[in-house]
Amino acid sequence: LTALANGLSLGRIHHAYLFSGTRGVGKTSIARLLAKGLNCESGITATPCGVCDNCREIEQGRFVDLIEIDAASRTKVEDTRDLLDNVQYAPARGRFKVYLIDEVHMLSRHSFNALLKTLEEPPAHVKFLLATTDPQKLPVTILSRCLQFHL
């Protein structure tokens, strides 16, 4: 996680992050903290303020530019395409539009292909935060486009 904090501090921000580890280890918590760091009103930071509107709304789960998806319940390619249809639009409030896809390994093969197209040429204003308990089930084409952190 030091590498993640250093990257934010230096402004080296990747377009896709993969957090893997056992259930309950904090994958989505770290992803939400990263979303705060990317969208904090005080600027891109490894230590978001936690008090600005953006940080508070992310904490409360109601920040319009943080789109959270549970892939376990949305495995179909149509769900993924619906999600990705909005990728080209700029963020409404934040610096970045952040897509947090939990249990990403549950997506179908066709869904992975749809996601891959966006990961190959992501808009500058979009960041993908992927979380999984089973990274071995992810296609190598997805893995190769993500900065990976095993927790």
PLM features per residue range, with description:
Residues 1-149:
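P-loop/Walker A NTP-binding region and its immediately flanking N-terminal helices
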